Amino acid sequence: METKDGFLVINKDKGCTSHDCVKQIRKLLNTKKVGHTGTLDPEVIGTLPIAIGNATRFIQYLPQGKTYIGEIKLGIRTSTDDIQGEIISQKSWPKISYKQLDQYFNRFRGIIKQIPPKVSSVHVNGERAYKKSFRNEIFELAPREVKIDELILMNWDQINGIIEIKIKCSAGTYIRSIARDIGETLNSAGCLLQLKRISACGFDEQNSIKISDIEKEKGKKNSKNFIIPTISALSHISTFVLSNEEQINFWQTGREIKVDINYFRESKSFDYKKPIKVIDNKQTLLGIGFLNKEQSNINPKLVLNAK
């Protein structure tokens, strides 16, 4: 497979870390410039977008929402807030109806505050929380604001105390914390039983591939190219086209581009605070800029092939 800039959407297997996937891709594509768009815990499967080449510079401009399907086991509290952790306590769960359980979920819809798991990558005094936890240090984590755009009750196994959910949330949301807190809200306990990420950063599982798929194509003369072009991953961002060589030269030397402000005012959905992708007439991505509406300029923020 020919290496070029863009994104690979990996369907991660259980037991593999996000960094493991990055290392394998680096080796398979023989390139060092590879990075993932957000960590998936080793036990979590599913969608892991990986940036290749210059696409690594555009990760921050991807959509930040993520969607998961998972199962919560009531009655068990663990050290890691998932089933892999040490059991801390056990408690019975309430015998409530599907409708009643869904009403409890209202507390977890919209903007909420959650405390991350002790075993997480959150920084505490300059160190990852999981490192302190592994040393059995005593520490507290501050609540963090996250947004739950959608929380759907998929199934309620009252006999075994297992809840299946679908959740669409902002980046930085810990589903293990959701599982723990749902258990506490029900005057019980809870931990995450299993989890699959079905979409992340604008990519979904329908476009995902296994790393083994790349391995099979390696060395073939007419191998499949699974890399999604960076410009395709930025389809949610407004576009401005540089129409002549003078404008392109200005852009590539880091100078602002004069624009007709009405070009953007015609778009009702345009937000002046959001980034703009800049391209040429051949649909080649040139970078990212921001509009200065007072001066009617696009100011370069990220420039590809800078001079």
Curated annotation (Swiss-Prot):
Pfam families referenced in this protein's UniProt entry, alphabetically: TruB_N (PF01509)
Record's keyword terms, sorted: Isomerase, tRNA processing
Enzyme class: isomerase
Active site positions, chain numbering: 41
Top-level lineage group: Bacteria
Disulfide pattern: none
EC numbers for this chain: 5.4.99.25
UniProt key word tRNA processing: yes
Region forming the signal peptide: none
Gene Ontology BP, a term: mRNA pseudouridine synthesis
SUPFAM superfamilies: Pseudouridine synthase
Catalytic reaction(s) noted: uridine(55) in tRNA = pseudouridine(55) in tRNA
UniProt-recorded Gene Ontology molecular function terms: RNA binding; tRNA pseudouridine(55) synthase activity
Described purpose of this protein according to its UniProt entry: Responsible for synthesis of pseudouridine from uracil-55 in the psi GC loop of transfer RNAs.
Record-stated family: Belongs to the pseudouridine synthase TruB family. Type 1 subfamily.
Protein name from the UniProt record: tRNA pseudouridine synthase B
Organism annotation: Prochlorococcus marinus (strain AS9601)
Lineage: Bacteria, Bacillati, Cyanobacteriota, Cyanophyceae, Synechococcales
